A protein has these predicted regions:
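Nucleotide-sugar-dependent glycosyltransferase donor-binding/catalytic pocket residues
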Residues: 54, 144-148, 176-179
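Residue-level signature of the cytosolic catalytic core of signaling kinases
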Residues: 12, 104, 144-148, 206, ...
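N-terminal Rossmann-like NAD(P)+-binding domain of SDR-like oxidoreductases, especially those catalyzing
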Residues: 1-139, 181, 265, 269-273
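C-terminal substrate-binding subdomain of Rossmann-fold SDR/epimerase-dehydratase oxidoreductases
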Residues: 21, 138, 157-276
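Residues that form or flank phosphate/diphosphate-binding pockets in enzymes
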Residues: 2, 29, 146, 208, ...
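Conserved donor sugar-nucleotide recognition element shared by glycan-biosynthetic enzymes
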Residues: 108, 116, 148, 210, ...
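Gly/Ser/Thr-rich beta-alpha loop segments that engage phosphate groups in nucleotides
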Residues: 4, 62, 87, 143-145, ...
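Glutamine-centric residue-chemistry signal
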Residues: 77, 126, 144-145, 158, ...
Length: 276
């Protein structure tokens, strides 16, 4: 989710323009590069409007590819680790085809992103579009929304307010968390790469359980929060960790910011936000 307040510093730049547009409708601009990042990515948000979510994934991809075709622009698709579903291979390599539910509550996002990838490859084959496909794993950092709905923001806000930290399931499910600055570097390197379309995993390969993450955040915030456990949602993956061998080889990319530093930066941001 974006926030216009984050762009206040560049609004006066004559080379910068904000255009508010729903990509489920065609867009007519003259353009050189397209970064297709438009889609709700938190389960709380995409499950609230699953039809719009899958339209954004699929119609959005078609419309942005149509724009790229007309303008001969290079286009990057922000795909997701969720295309691997609840993986049977660990860590996940780009060659893994996934184990994804087609009718569960997460399918609007997971299958929407899978379909978008297919459309990108078809446009490349049929229309020779210059495409780039990245698969983003869990990412966090300053400027996340308070109501983002994912574990890092949820846990930090609950800890700063000394409220119970809610874990869904037993907390043994694992994730790997990439700091936003590292992700942005990977995205830029991918867009600038030559003769490489992807797909490529972009994420931090250091794995952690959700329970351990909660405990780290409690310690870093000095919170009196207690951890409580609730029922695990349907189709929630048991583990998620990227194999980034291709990113290292093709992009010379590897995450640099460790979790302790990244969490401290994110905690400071949310602390300031809550106090304001």
């Amino acid at each position: 989710q974006g926030n216009k307040d984050n762009l206040l510093k560049v609004l006066d730049n004559k080379n910068f323009e904000i255009i508010r547009h729903d990509i489920t409708f065609p867009l007519f601009l003259e353009i050189d590069e397209i970064y297709n990042l438009a889609c709700p990515a938190s389960p709380v948000h995409y499950q609230n409007d699953p039809v719009q979510t899958i339209k954004t994934c699929v119609h959005g991809a078609i419309n942005m590819l149509g724009l790229a075709k007309r303008t001969k622009a290079k286009i990057l698709q922000a795909s997701t680790s969720e295309i691997y579903g609840d993986p049977e291979v660990h860590p996940q390599q780009e060659s893994y085809k996934g184990a994804v539910s087609i009718d569960g509550p997460r399918a609007c996002y997971d299958e929407g992103k899978r379909c978008a990838e297919t459309i990108f490859w078809d446009y490349q084959r049929q229309h020779n579009i210059d495409i780039k496909v990245i698969r983003i794993f869990n990412t966090y950092g300053p400027r996340m929304q308070i109501n983002d709905g994912r574990v890092v923001s949820n846990f930090i806000v609950q800890a700063l307010e000394n409220k119970n930290i809610t874990i869904y399931g037993n907390g043994l499910q694992t994730r790997s968390f990439c700091y936003v600055d590292d992700l942005i570097e990977g995205i830029v390197l991918m867009m600038e790469s030559k003769d490489f379309a992807g797909p490529v995993n972009l994420g931090n390969p250091v794995e952690i359980s959700v329970k351990q993450l909660a405990e780290e955040i409690i310690e870093l915030t000095g919170s009196s929060s207690k951890i409580i456990f609730k029922k695990l949602p349907q189709d929630d993956p048991k583990q998620r960790c990227p194999d980034i061998s291709i990113a290292k080889d093709k992009l010379s990319w590897t995450p640099k910011i460790n979790r302790d530093i990244g969490l401290k930066k994110t905690i400071r941001y949310f602390d300031t936000l809550l106090k304001s």
